Structures are given as structure tokens and as C-alpha cells.
């Protein structure tokens, strides 16, 4: 069943906003994970993780959504634009999505609610890579996962606003020289609509 959120008293400040305001990032530091945004399920358009104890986080605060999702006939690709040590670094997840998910538009992301995908290098699991300025190279993935903890629909003033996609991830990978790459504490809280969901399945 599709989940529906009616923004009411608890989100009074958000009800006064226009739809365009949902595209802004709302960054709140996590006191338990210094440098990362809190884990949230409010569509704050933030994400982050530690990469070998270095902070990877959303590329800009307060700007338009710095991420996008692309669906085709075989997979769903989620690209998170970010920073690590002052340089551009993008984290790209590729999830195997078969026809049972019917990802025709962003509302269909609700079918992923509560789903968890293992991360490794097999065709039936989620894969991940880095892009950007001198990104780490991954040659193998030892173990990991990405979980969609909560996916929910937001209605504001009786109109569809967005789908909130929130979840967690972590994985251990290895580079070409055998060096280990540990990604831990990963979290994302994304507001998705027709502006950042692209469908190539048609």
C-alpha cells in the first residue's frame, strides 16, 4: 500500500513553503557522526558517509537537489553528487531492477519501501562506483548493502509534492593495488519528483 504523509502541525513551517522549497537541502549536523548530516526521513535532500574515515557529504547546502535517479529496463541508478576532502566526488549506485517493480515514474519508487540490496560485483546485486576528481577505483567489493528504510509520498495543500526516499548504506571494497576502502555510516534522505527522476524504461 502506498504510504501517504499529510503535512500538518508537526511540519507547519513546511506547509508555508512552495513546491520549489522542497528542492532545497536542509543540512543538520549529526552530533554522533561529526561531519555528516543526521539520518532523517523528511526529504532534507542530504546524504553522507565516511570513506576510510574521511567525510563524504552532499556537495552544497541550500542549493537545488544535488542528486538524480535514472531508471531503465534493467536497473535503477542513483547518483549522489558530493565532496570529500574539498574535492568533487560522486557516489553512483546501480541496482538491478526487473519488470516487477514497474518504475514508470517517480511515484513507483514506493515499491522499494523497506527493500534491501546486497552490494557486490555480481549481476544480481547492487554495484557502486565513484566518479569525480581522482576518484577511488573499485576493483572488487567484499560486502555491503543499501537499504531503503522508508519511502513515502508527500501531499501539500492536496497536491502531490514529492516522494521521500530515505535509507542507509555501507560497504567494503578494494582498489587495484589491494588497498581497502571502507564506507560506513552511509545515509540519504532524498526528495524525488519529475525534475530528478529520469525514466528510460519506456
Residue ranges of model-derived segments:
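C-terminal or internal capping secondary-structure element at the end of a domain, subdomain, or sheet
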Residues: 144-202
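Short capping micro-motif at the N-terminus of alpha-helices
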Residues: 58-59, 119, 183
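Short acidic/polar mixed-charge low-complexity motifs
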Residues: 54, 87-89, 179-180
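A mature extracytoplasmic/lumenal domain signature
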Residues: 53-55, 60-62, 84, 95-97, ...
Amino acid at each position: 500500500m502506498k504510504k501517504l504523509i499529510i503535512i500538518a502541525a508537526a511540519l507547519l513551517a513546511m506547509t508555508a513553503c512552495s513546491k520549489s522549497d522542497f528542492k532545497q537541502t536542509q543540512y543538520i549536523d549529526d552530533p554522533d557522526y561529526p561531519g555528516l548530516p543526521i539520518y532523517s526521513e523528511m526529504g532534507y535532500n542530504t546524504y553522507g558517509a565516511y570513506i576510510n574515515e574521511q567525510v563524504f557529504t552532499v556537495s552544497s547546502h541550500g542549493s537545488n537537489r544535488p542528486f538524480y535517479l535514472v531508471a531503465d529496463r534493467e536497473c535503477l541508478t542513483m547518483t549522489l553528487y558530493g565532496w570529500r576532502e574539498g574535492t568533487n566526488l560522486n557516489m553512483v549506485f546501480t541496482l538491478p531492477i526487473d519488470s516487477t517493480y514497474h518504475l514508470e515514474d517517480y511515484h513507483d519508487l514506493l515499491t522499494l519501501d523497506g527493500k534491501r540490496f546486497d552490494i557486490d560485483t555480481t549481476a544480481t546485486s547492487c554495484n557502486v562506483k565513484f566518479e569525480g576528481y581522482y576518484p577511488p577505483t573499485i576493483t572488487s567489493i567484499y560486502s555491503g548493502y543499501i537499504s531503503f528504510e522508508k519511502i513515502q509520498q508527500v501531499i501539500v495543500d492536496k497536491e502531490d509534492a514529492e516522494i521521500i526516499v530515505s535509507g542507509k548504506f555501507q560497504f567494503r571494497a578494494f582498489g587495484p593495488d589491494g588497498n581497502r576502502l571502507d564506507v560506513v555510516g552511509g545515509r540519504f534522505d532524498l526528495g524525488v519528483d519529475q525534475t530528478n527522476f529520469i525514466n528510460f524504461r519506456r
